[in-house]
Amino acid sequence: MAGKGSYVPPQYIPLYSLDTEEDRVPAVEENHATRPKLNQDPTQWSSGICACFDDPQSCCIGAICPCFLFGKNAQFLGSGTLAGSCTTHCMLWGLLTSLCCVFTGGLVLAVPGSAVACYACGYRSALRTKYNLPEAPCGDLTTHLFCHLCAICQEYREIRERTGSGSSPAPNVTPPPVQTMDEL
C-alpha cells in the first residue's frame, strides 16, 4: 500500500457548534487537548421577569389561563402538542389544589405551586440551554416557585422574540385569475 499516511479523514463538526470559522475543528489536530471553545458567555433574556406589562397580550393570557401559555411554551420546546402540556399543567394544578384544600381545610395552598414549579422548571431549563440564557433572576426552580406566572410569561416572550413569531405580518396571498374554456 503506497501512501499509507496520506489519508486525512473528513472534518468533524459537532452538532452543537455554530457554523462559523472560529468554531470549526481543524481537520488534523496537533494537540487533542486543545479544542475550540463555544461561546461560554450567556446571552441576556430579551425581557425581565417582571416585564409582564410591557407585553399586555402575554400578561393577560398568563393571568387568565396560564395553562395555555405554558402549553405553548412546552409545545415549542418539543413536548409534541399544545393540548398535552396545557392539560397536564391544568390537571396537575387543579388536582393538587383540590387535595390540599380537602386535607388541610384550605390552609396549605403553597404545595400545588411547588409541585407545578418542579414540573415547569424543566422547560425553563430547556429554554435556557437552547438559547444559552443565564439562570436569572434565580435558579429555575426558585423562579417558578415564587414567580410562576411571571416566569411562564417571560419564557413565552423569549420564545416569541427569538423565533419571530407574532411579529411578522401575514403574507398577502392573491388567488389566480379566473380562467374559462371557450368552445371552438
UniProtKB/Swiss-Prot annotation:
Keyword Transmembrane: yes
InterPro entries the UniProt entry points to: PLAC_motif_containing
Membrane-crossing residue ranges in chain numbering: 91-111
Membrane topology field: Single-pass membrane protein
GO CC, alphabetical: membrane
Keyword Membrane (UniProt): yes
Short name of one Pfam family: PLAC8
Free-text tissue specificity from the UniProt record: Expressed in roots, leaves, stalks, immature ears, endosperm and pollen.
Subcellular location as annotated: Membrane
Region Disordered, residue ranges: 162-184
Keywords annotated in UniProt: Membrane, Transmembrane, Transmembrane helix
Family to which this protein belongs: Belongs to the cornifelin family.
Name of the protein in question: Cell number regulator 5
Native source organism of the sequence: Zea mays
